[in-house]
Amino acid sequence: MDIDLHDYIATTPDFPEKGVMFRDINPLIGNGPAYRQAINELIDFARPLKPDIIAGPEARGFVVGSPMAYALGIGFVPARKYGKLPRKSVSSSYSLEYGKNELQMHVDSIKPGQRVFIVDDLLATGGTITATMDLVRQLGGQVVGTGFFIELADLQGRKKIMEVENVPFKSLLEY
């Protein structure tokens, strides 16, 4: 039986700042059947794209990408916030819906030519994902697709992704 994943997204107005409608995935990832369904839907989308590795930005991209990588029998590469990696890394800056940030990956985390599927919990403006795409490209990887639990359609993140690179795209829920 399919679960309506909308039932497992909590909405908090004016968080983290006024005017932002925060979509909280904690109820979804806290419910085994709903979490399993969401991960399986993204796996079903990613599998035909034949990724060699899954990548996801800190922190909630880890929650989406790690179980996908495990189920597909491939690795997971974290895109970490600035200053969290101890070895040589590449960096990419981006703007968030409510601020600015920088992501990094170790230089040996993706090998040239690897097929990379990028995931996150939520797509807003597209800054986090396009920064992750930039990191993958800096390391010689090929982005084969992107997937999200939630897409905030009004913020046009999908458009931003497609302007950077026209890749297969999947969001499970749209607000």
From Swiss-Prot:
GO molecular function: adenine binding; adenine phosphoribosyltransferase activity; AMP binding
Annotated pathway: Purine metabolism; AMP biosynthesis via salvage pathway; AMP from adenine: step 1/1
Pfam families xrefs: Pribosyltran (PF00156)
Keyword list, A-Z: Cytoplasm, Glycosyltransferase, Purine salvage, Transferase
CDD domains for the chain: PRTases_typeI
Top-level taxonomic group: Bacteria
Location(s) in or outside the cell: Cytoplasm
InterPro entries the record matches: Ade_phspho_trans, PRibTrfase_dom, PRTase-like, UPRTase/APRTase
GO cellular component, one term: cytoplasm
Broad class of the protein's primary localization: cytoplasm
EC primary class: transferase
UniProt keyword RNA-binding, yes or no: no
UniProt keyword annotation of Ribosomal protein present: no
Annotated catalysed reactions: AMP + diphosphate = 5-phospho-alpha-D-ribose 1-diphosphate + adenine
Ranges in a coiled coil: none
Leader peptide range in chain numbering: none
UniProt-listed Enzyme Commission number(s): 2.4.2.7
GO biological process: adenine salvage; AMP salvage; purine ribonucleoside salvage
Known function: Catalyzes a salvage reaction resulting in the formation of AMP, that is energically less costly than de novo synthesis.
Subunit organization: Homodimer.
Family to which this protein belongs: Belongs to the purine/pyrimidine phosphoribosyltransferase family.
Protein name as catalogued: Adenine phosphoribosyltransferase
Organism placement in taxonomy: Bacteria, Bacillati, Bacillota, Bacilli, Lactobacillales
Primary gene name: apt
